[in-house]
Amino acid sequence: MEVQELFLLALAISLDAFGVILCIGINKGITLKSSMIFVFSFGFFQFFLSFLGGYIGTIFNKYIVPIPTIVGGLIIIIVGILMITEGFKEKEESIFLNKIMYLILGVSVSIDALVIGFTTLSYINNLFYLFMSSLFMGLIATIICSLGIILSKYIKKISIISSYADYIGGIILILFGLKMLFF
C-alpha cells in the first residue's frame, strides 16, 4: 500500500473521531487534561484496532464486517442521549470526566479501524509493515483529534453554542450514530 493511500485511509477513519472530539471539546465541563486523554485514547485505539484487524483479518473478515458499524453507532447514540440528559442537569462534573468514557468512546470511534484492518491491512504480510501502517493510522487520528480540540475551543467562544453545547453535541452524536447504523 502506498503512503498516499494509507494517509487517505487514515484520514477517512479519523473523521469519526474528529466529529466526536468536537462535541466533547465544546462541552462546558471538559478540561484540557481530559480532552488530551480523549485525543490519545482515540489515537491509540485507531492504532490498536487497525493492527488487530490486520493481524487476524483473513480469519474473521466475513463474520465481523457488519457488526462493528452497528455496535459503534449504538454506542455513539447512547453517548448523545447521555449528553442531552446531562444538559438538563445542573451539576459540576461532566459525563466526559468519567474515566470509563475514555475507553468507551475510544473504542466506539475506532471500530471502523478494526474493519479497515480486516479488509485492507490484512494484505500486508510483513508484521513490521503492518505495525508501522497501524501506527501511522493512530498518529494521523491523534493529529486530527488534536486539531478538533483546538477548533472546539474557538467554537466554544460563540455564546449560543456555549449555552447549548450539551444539546448540540448530543444531537450531532445521535445523528452521527444513526448515520453509522443506516447509511
Swiss-Prot record:
Q: Name one Pfam family in it.
A: Mntp
Cellular component (GO) terms are: plasma membrane
Domain of life, per UniProt, equals Bacteria
Q: What membrane topology term does the record carry?
A: Multi-pass membrane protein
GO MF, any single term: manganese ion transmembrane transporter activity
The answer to whether keyword Cell inner membrane applies is no
* Primary location: membrane
Keyword terms:
Cell membrane, Ion transport, Manganese, Membrane, Transmembrane, Transmembrane helix, Transport
Signal peptide location: none
Tell me yes or no: is Chaperone among this UniProt entry's keywords: no
Q: Which GO terms describe its biological process?
A: intracellular manganese ion homeostasis; manganese ion export across plasma membrane
Question: Where does this one sit in the cell?
Answer: Cell membrane
Which residue spans traverse the membrane? 6-26, 36-56, 64-84, 100-120, 130-150, 158-178
Return the similarity comment. Answer: Belongs to the MntP (TC 9.B.29) family.
Q: What does this protein do?
A: Probably functions as a manganese efflux pump.
Official protein name in the record = Putative manganese efflux pump MntP 1
